[in-house]
Amino acid sequence: MKYSRRTNLSDEFTKQATKEIHEELEHNSQILKSCQNDEDFSNKCSEIEKHFHKIKGLAPMMGQKKIGELASLNDELIKKILEGEKIKGIFETIKQSNKLMKDLMQDSTVEIDGLKQTIKTKYAEFFD
């Protein structure tokens, strides 16, 4: 009986977390649609960072490690912008990352290693 209840709670958590991640990614999509370039994106960073931060925390807890890793990289870069850094090309990178995370929510076999490596290489100076 306890096992069944635990499973139900776990299933319910996963269902709710999945719904929340979809919502957070959709919020990001809407914000990104209102941007045209790095400067526009920089002006919306505080809003979008909240969504990535939530995704970064929720995704690994529900078995979406890849999404969590990508959200973490993006969250770190956005925090640098919020600290006053100018990051060339960040708008396109974030847009690509958000799309890939949405794709991952539909198909867990989507490959992210290429984008992760590109981010780590292109923006190496911003990572500790």
Predicted feature residues:
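Non-catalytic helical tethers at domain boundaries
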Residues: 1-128
